[in-house]
């Protein structure tokens, strides 16, 4: 594939005209290209396999088991998902491999997940799962099977390949065409070198079209419900699951003006901006308005709450992020300038784009300071700040801290 300019060596705005989306028809001689599809047992990966097969690629599937426990009957179990994946592969006539990455998942994802909750933060394990398992362990395994590419059912796109300033062949991550389903937020930590070996067949489609294709091919997954929630929890109650691994310590619920009004079940069960499930009824001499989580006082094990959807303690103008992953492999040079990098950001999934400036706070651009044009509500440490310019996802990092106009 042709070389492309990258945002590390030229102005960011000038580079993006060259970031052409990669489509399946762009790849030469597909009949000589071996693609292994991550088959989850869902409709998106099923249709991805169909589209690749129709485009002429040599296609096989691989089902990943990332979690050993499978003791529930109220949610779709791994065995059910495997059966559906096998049924789809049988239907379209491709081989299905299986691989167990449970040990890798525990070491690289789950232990980090527990450590973050123990530290009072709210992590997003799906982002780390994509980085460490789906686009690392799976990719590495697929390459041993002779794959030229892997493919997944994510609603995102990527550019054609180009070489960055270090001479490494990479691709840029692009938003999916379906704005309601775009998953680039969850894939921002996947390196461009991994993206260069990945195909996203449904990234050019909207969800209703994907289901229509599945129905036309009489796939068992055509009307299967989309999976929701953290992958290893399934449909189980989050609190019940977390209690198996982290002992909860009850503490006081305190208002923003210092009044004790209740008892919380453990700070790890709450997140900033949360409204429901706090366990506060009517409070004497207070208006009948909803209560929101404003802060966690870790030193004193107190949950700070207040009333008002736009309470000042929930608003912040700046955040500090660390563990930055830049898709290109190199940070945009603009973050080292006095003016910073002008771009859009999301501090949570599905949040509308927020205008901001990004400044490096260390020499390699792995930590940044983000200043928003407008105050942001309920920015949560442990979640990710992800940066965009138009359709291009530049990368992102973990939110370490925020500033707030008011403190407790």
UniProtKB/Swiss-Prot annotation:
<comment type="similarity">
    <text>Belongs to the MnmA/TRMU family.</text>
</comment>
<keyword id="KW-0547">Nucleotide-binding</keyword>
<protein>
    <recommendedName>
        <fullName>tRNA-specific 2-thiouridylase MnmA</fullName>
        <ecNumber>2.8.1.13</ecNumber>
    </recommendedName>
</protein>
<dbReference type="InterPro" id="IPR023382">
    <property type="entry name" value="MnmA-like_central_sf"/>
</dbReference>
<keyword id="KW-0808">Transferase</keyword>
<dbReference type="GO" id="GO:0005524">
    <property type="term" value="F:ATP binding"/>
</dbReference>
<feature type="active site" description="Nucleophile">
    <location>
        <position position="129"/>
    </location>
</feature>
<dbReference type="InterPro" id="IPR004506">
    <property type="entry name" value="MnmA-like"/>
</dbReference>
<dbReference type="Pfam" id="PF03054">
    <property type="entry name" value="tRNA_Me_trans"/>
</dbReference>
<keyword id="KW-1015">Disulfide bond</keyword>
<dbReference type="InterPro" id="IPR046884">
    <property type="entry name" value="MnmA-like_central"/>
</dbReference>
<dbReference type="InterPro" id="IPR014729">
    <property type="entry name" value="Rossmann-like_a/b/a_fold"/>
</dbReference>
<dbReference type="GO" id="GO:0103016">
    <property type="term" value="F:tRNA-uridine 2-sulfurtransferase activity"/>
</dbReference>
<dbReference type="Pfam" id="PF20259">
    <property type="entry name" value="tRNA_Me_trans_M"/>
</dbReference>
<comment type="function">
    <text>Catalyzes the 2-thiolation of uridine at the wobble position (U34) of tRNA, leading to the formation of s(2)U34.</text>
</comment>
<keyword id="KW-0819">tRNA processing</keyword>
<dbReference type="GO" id="GO:0005737">
    <property type="term" value="C:cytoplasm"/>
</dbReference>
<feature type="binding site">
    <location>
        <position position="153"/>
    </location>
    <ligand>
        <name>ATP</name>
    </ligand>
</feature>
<dbReference type="GO" id="GO:0002143">
    <property type="term" value="P:tRNA wobble position uridine thiolation"/>
</dbReference>
<feature type="binding site">
    <location>
        <begin position="38"/>
        <end position="45"/>
    </location>
    <ligand>
        <name>ATP</name>
    </ligand>
</feature>
<feature type="site" description="Interaction with tRNA">
    <location>
        <position position="383"/>
    </location>
</feature>
<feature type="region of interest" description="Interaction with tRNA">
    <location>
        <begin position="181"/>
        <end position="183"/>
    </location>
</feature>
<keyword id="KW-0820">tRNA-binding</keyword>
<feature type="disulfide bond" description="Alternate">
    <location>
        <begin position="129"/>
        <end position="231"/>
    </location>
</feature>
<keyword id="KW-0067">ATP-binding</keyword>
<keyword id="KW-0963">Cytoplasm</keyword>
<keyword id="KW-0694">RNA-binding</keyword>
<feature type="site" description="Interaction with tRNA">
    <location>
        <position position="154"/>
    </location>
</feature>
<dbReference type="Pfam" id="PF20258">
    <property type="entry name" value="tRNA_Me_trans_C"/>
</dbReference>
<feature type="region of interest" description="Interaction with tRNA">
    <location>
        <begin position="348"/>
        <end position="349"/>
    </location>
</feature>
<dbReference type="InterPro" id="IPR046885">
    <property type="entry name" value="MnmA-like_C"/>
</dbReference>
<feature type="region of interest" description="Interaction with target base in tRNA">
    <location>
        <begin position="124"/>
        <end position="126"/>
    </location>
</feature>
<dbReference type="GO" id="GO:0000049">
    <property type="term" value="F:tRNA binding"/>
</dbReference>
<feature type="active site" description="Cysteine persulfide intermediate">
    <location>
        <position position="231"/>
    </location>
</feature>
<feature type="binding site">
    <location>
        <position position="64"/>
    </location>
    <ligand>
        <name>ATP</name>
    </ligand>
</feature>
């Amino acid at each position: 594939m042709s070389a492309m300019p990258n945002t590390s060596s030229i102005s960011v705005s000038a580079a993006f005209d060259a970031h052409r989306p990669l489509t399946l028809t762009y790849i030469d001689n597909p009949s000589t290209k071996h693609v292994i599809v991550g088959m989850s047992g869902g409709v998106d990966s099923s249709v991805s396999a169909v589209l690749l097969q129709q485009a002429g690629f040599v296609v096989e599937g691989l089902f990943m088991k990332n979690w050993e426990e499978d003791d529930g009957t109220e949610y779709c179990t791994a065995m059910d998902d495997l059966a559906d994946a096998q049924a789809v592969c049988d239907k379209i006539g491709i081989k299905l491999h299986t691989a167990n990455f449970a040990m890798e998942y525990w070491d690289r994802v789950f232990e980090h997940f527990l450590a973050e909750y123990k530290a009072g933060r709210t992590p997003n394990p799906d982002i780390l799962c994509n980085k460490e398992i789906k686009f690392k362990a799976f990719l590495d395994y697929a390459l041993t099977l002779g794959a030229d590419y892997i493919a997944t059912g994510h609603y995102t796109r990527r550019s054609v390949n180009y070489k960055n300033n270090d001479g490494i062949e990479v691709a840029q991550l692009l938003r999916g065409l379906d704005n309601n389903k775009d998953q680039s937020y969850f894939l921002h930590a996947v390196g461009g070198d991994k993206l260069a070996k990945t195909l996203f067949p449904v990234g050019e489609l909207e969800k209703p079209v994907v289901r229509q294709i599945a129905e036309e091919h009489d796939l068992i997954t055509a009307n299967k419900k989309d999976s929701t929630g953290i992958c290893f929890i399934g449909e189980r109650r989050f609190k019940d699951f977390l209690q198996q691994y982290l002992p909860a310590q009850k503490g006081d619920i305190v208002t923003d003006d210092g009044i004790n009004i209740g008892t919380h079940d453990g700070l790890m069960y709450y997140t900033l901006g949360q409204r429901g499930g706090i366990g506060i009824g009517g409070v004497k001499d207070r208006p009948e308005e909803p209560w929101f989580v404003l802060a966690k006082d870790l030193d004193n094990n107190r949950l700070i709450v207040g009333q008002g959807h736009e309470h000042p303690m929930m608003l912040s103008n700046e955040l500090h992020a660390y563990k930055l992953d830049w898709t290109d492999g190199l940070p945009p040079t603009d973050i080292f300038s006095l003016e910073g990098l002008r771009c859009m950001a999301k501090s949570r999934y599905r949040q509308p784009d927020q205008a901001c400036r990004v400044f490096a706070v260390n020499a390699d651009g792995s930590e940044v300071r983000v200043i928003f044009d407008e105050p942001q509500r309920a920015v949560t440490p442990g979640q990710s700040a992800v940066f965009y310019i138009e359709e291009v996802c530049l990368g992102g990092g973990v939110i370490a801290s925020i500033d707030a106009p008011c403190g407790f």
